[in-house]
């Protein structure tokens, strides 16, 4: 039956890459450099995937609805930043949390909490591992709460289900890269990916096809047939290739047949399905408010305002939107709110108006600014519910209890014909990061090139 389908393919390339996020672009670049014909298919009308830089003309800075920070010394990413002739700017270092009704330095408690997360071991729920660690120890209540707050917010994980071993591996890898040193890319993350795309198109003009929704990947050893349609529903010509690099997010890989964005593989990939089921795409919700002025710094100078000078991050454990950050060192009236894990799921279930209200309530509690003042100062907003996005279905991969080793399975080539990339396939502790995604794209391209060269030698 599969052989019958090849006759109707009207378009042929060496390799088809599914997904034009960081992993897909990195893979396409490597393949194009090797002088292979490449087709890069992207369901969205833009590149970037979970990198979603917006540059609204009436906002004072570029804004990120997706990935935003360069975490520590990520060599692969920083090399690409330099190649694109961009710069990274450290964020505001001051991190405060609401404690006993006032904003206080969170650093001492946060350092202790993060150190504890870095020692997590065992394929048991994070909550269980933390409780075992804390049993008999005199740990301040704030530090105990911050450990859980950090895992749920930063890793988008449910502490009752996520594997302590997996979270510990991620945190130890982050610390090795000085991941607590956050910076932004001047002009936005998208600039790096645009530079990669220009490299692809220089070697493979016309490789990128946007608004192209892949619906089916039929494969046999050494051959792939891809079916796709436009976002409007219009069926596109079938595409035949010698190999495919699949870079769709874990959430899309897990999507049930018939769901928006889901891709059918024929024959089915049973090992991939089982491995994907052992992980989840952690929920994330991100919102940005543009205020007429930086209200947290305005008004008559007081000791309170002095504490907020140079503010980078503010935390409200227990709040509906518990994490906020400024654009420091750039001064503006823009605040970004972030919720991960169960809190993101709660926000996702609410109407937009109620979500906005919950977010403003959180800011009122944090800064003591009356709700009416916040509403009067609010000029614009942007929000993105990543779990409701059919081409993401969440923020980034979280390994559940019983899922250790799943990423290794997801990264494994199939019949030297299907190759997989994306942050969920990372096995070096860099899952959930742009640099991890870039590195997996490069790895999948190397694997694909090696397989194609071996085929050529075997003829």
Model-predicted regions and their roles:
Residues 1-459:
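FAD-dinucleotide binding site
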């Amino acid at each position: 039956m599969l052989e019958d389908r090849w006759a109707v393919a009207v378009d042929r390339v060496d390799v088809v890459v599914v997904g034009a996020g960081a992993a897909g672009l990195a893979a396409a670049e490597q393949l194009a450099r090797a002088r292979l014909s490449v087709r890069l298919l992207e369901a969205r009308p833009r590149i970037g995937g979970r990198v979603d830089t917006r540059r609204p003309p009436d906002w004072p800075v570029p804004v990120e609805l997706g990935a935003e920070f360069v975490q520590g010394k990520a060599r692969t990413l920083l090399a690409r930043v330099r190649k694109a002739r961009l710069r990274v700017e450290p964020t505001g270092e001051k991190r405060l949390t609401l404690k006993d009704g006032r904003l206080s330095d969170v650093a001492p408690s946060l350092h202790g909490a993060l150190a504890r997360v870095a020692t997590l071991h065992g394929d048991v729920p994070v909550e269980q591992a933390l409780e075992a660690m804390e049993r008999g120890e005199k740990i301040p209540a704030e530090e105990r709460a911050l450990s859980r707050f950090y895992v749920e917010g930063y890793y988008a994980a449910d502490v009752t289900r996520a594997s302590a071993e997996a979270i510990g591996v991620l945190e130890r890898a982050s610390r090795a890269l000085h991941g607590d040193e956050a910076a932004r890319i001047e002009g936005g993350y998208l600039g790096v990916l645009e530079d990669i795309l220009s490299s692809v198109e220089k070697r493979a003009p016309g490789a990128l096809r946007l608004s192209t929704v892949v619906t089916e990947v039929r494969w046999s050893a050494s051959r792939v047939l891809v079916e796709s349609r436009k976002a409007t529903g219009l069926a596109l010509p079938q595409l035949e290739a010698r190999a495919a690099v699949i870079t769709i997010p874990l959430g899309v890989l897990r999507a049930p047949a018939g769901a928006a964005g889901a891709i059918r593989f024929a024959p089915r990939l049973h090992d991939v399905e089982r491995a994907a089921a052992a992980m989840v795409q952690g929920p994330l919700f991100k919102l940005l408010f543009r205020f007429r002025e930086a209200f947290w710094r305005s008004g008559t100078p007081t000791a309170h305002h002095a504490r907020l000078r140079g503010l980078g991050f503010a935390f409200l454990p227990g709040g509906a939107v518990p994490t906020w950050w400024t654009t420091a060192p750039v001064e503006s009236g823009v605040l970004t709110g972030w919720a991960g894990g169960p809190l993101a799921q709660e926000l996702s279930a609410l109407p937009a108006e109620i979500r906005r209200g919950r977010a403003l309530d959180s800011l009122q509690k944090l800064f003591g600014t009356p709700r009416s003042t916040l509403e009067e100062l609010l000029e614009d907003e942007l929000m993105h519910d990543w779990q409701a996005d059919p081409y993401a279905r969440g923020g980034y991969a979280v390994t559940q209890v019983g899922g250790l080793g799943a990423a290794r399975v997801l990264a494994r080539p199939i019949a030297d014909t299907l190759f997989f990339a994306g942050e969920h396939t990372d096995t070096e502790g860099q899952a959930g990061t742009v640099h991890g995604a870039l590195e997996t794209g490069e790895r999948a391209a190397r694997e694909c090139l090696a397989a194609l060269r071996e085929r050529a030698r075997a003829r």
